[in-house]
Amino acid sequence: TISFRLKEDTSWAKKGHEVAFGQGVIAVVRSIPSKKVTPFTVTHGTHNIGVRGENFDVLFSDLNGGLTSYHYAGKEMIQEIPRPNFWRAPTDNDCGNNMGGVRGQWKLASLYATAKGIGKEIPSVHGGTILQNPTCEVEADSVVVTYLYNLQTSPAAECSLQYRVFGDGRIQTTLHYDPVEGLAAMPEFGVLFKIDADYDTVEWYGNGPAETYWDRQHGAKLGIYQNKVADNMAQYLVPQECGAKTAVRWAKVVDRKGRGLLFTADAAKPMFFSALPYTPHEMESAKHPYELPPVHYTVIRAMGEQMGVGGDDSWGANVHPEYIPDVTKPVEFTFTFRGI
């Protein structure tokens, strides 16, 4: 980081006030020591797949179609099954260009994605091999559990959500989507978690300190920042999308004792990240802040892409195409989470 600051006081700012800065990322090549394989055990039940390792255990449900439990250090870390998410709350700018009407199928896809043919052999929408859902593959260093979801769109679409569980408690997560002709671009591509509201502090290595978006990040600095989850809710007259963070290498959401979840992404392909007291749907449903529901969860969204917020005008201009996820080709997003 290069920073230019005032050498002396002026009528408009004190000595030391920053007037300009520039940043560049320098890649450091390091040899990565080979990691030892931490032992784990896999249990296949009638309706569940369990994995137990060093200080953790996880449970995947055949009946409910997802990761239903992640215990770390004796504490349950998730409150609901993580879900593929393709929707962000509309902004005032979006209302002018009818984003909800044009892209509304992705809201339904987020709310009502259903695991395909739970516990049965099923064909893919795209043809090809018969799939068991979920699939479970035990490898030398990890267990790979993959779910295939039907998305409530027309024409029909599907996505897969893969969990690779390592013996030390890390879960590498990959969301994959193959394009379907005739569908509008999605506002967001990521995974939504609900954890207990006691996890109320977020720290991240990425752009900050203020919120940033795909088309609102050039004035931000790459660094390590921290704030309260509640402070990421902008005080708009009408609740709408807010609090996003771009270029995130890692982020952790913790309670007052420092316990929580750590999310990491490849530095070469950092993620978008959000930690708020509400889901996009709860924010969208409230026309005034007092209509927001009581806070029960911290809602985490780890995202490969999120549509920008636009703003050329607020009465019809769309977000620029380069800031909208491209769904004309396969889309994949990989990140890792673990308890801390």
Where are these regions (language model features)?
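Beta-strand/loop-rich accessory regions of lumenal/periplasmic or secreted enzymes
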Residues: 10, 24-340
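Short acidic/polar inter-strand loop motif in beta-rich domains
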Residues: 4-12
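Extracellular and select intracellular beta-sandwich modules with Ser/Thr-enriched
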Residues: 15-22
